[in-house]
Amino acid sequence: MMNRRLQAFFFRTAVVLALGSVYPVQVVSAQETAVDEPPYEQQLMRLSEIFGALHFLRPLCKESDTPSWRDRMEDFLDAETLDENRRRRFIERFNQGYRGFSVAYRECTEAARLAMAQYLSEGEVIISDVTSRYGR
């Protein structure tokens, strides 16, 4: 059974996914060279990295999550990104989070469990901050 903290994190993740419909990405014309980033862009980039880290750490420590963190990332991308370049940046951050831990850990250790707990906590803070500041 899922603990309350993890359930709260999943709920907040769903709220962030819904932000994609509240704050759609602006369509750029041919003359524009860059897409205006939403004010919470860096927080979402960090969240992507956290998703990648958790996608590696949770199964390593025999934690089964349904849907997987990769599936959550795909849902997030579908909800948040219309621009292909922006989508690629989120994917790269996810992959950085995954690779960073895959090089360091081959088995679940106390340090891996601590990192996992800290990432869950940081993800909760990011989601709470983004939804409270921009979800209105």
Model-derived features with residue positions:
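Bacterial N-terminal signal peptides
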Residues: 12-24
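Sec/Tat signal peptide C-region and signal peptidase I cleavage site
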Residues: 24-30
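Compact alpha-helical subdomains of small soluble proteins
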Residues: 65-136
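N-terminal secretory signal peptides that target proteins for export/translocation
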Residues: 1-8
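N-terminal secretory signal peptides
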Residues: 30-75, 129-136
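Alpha-helical transmembrane segments
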Residues: 9-14, 44-47
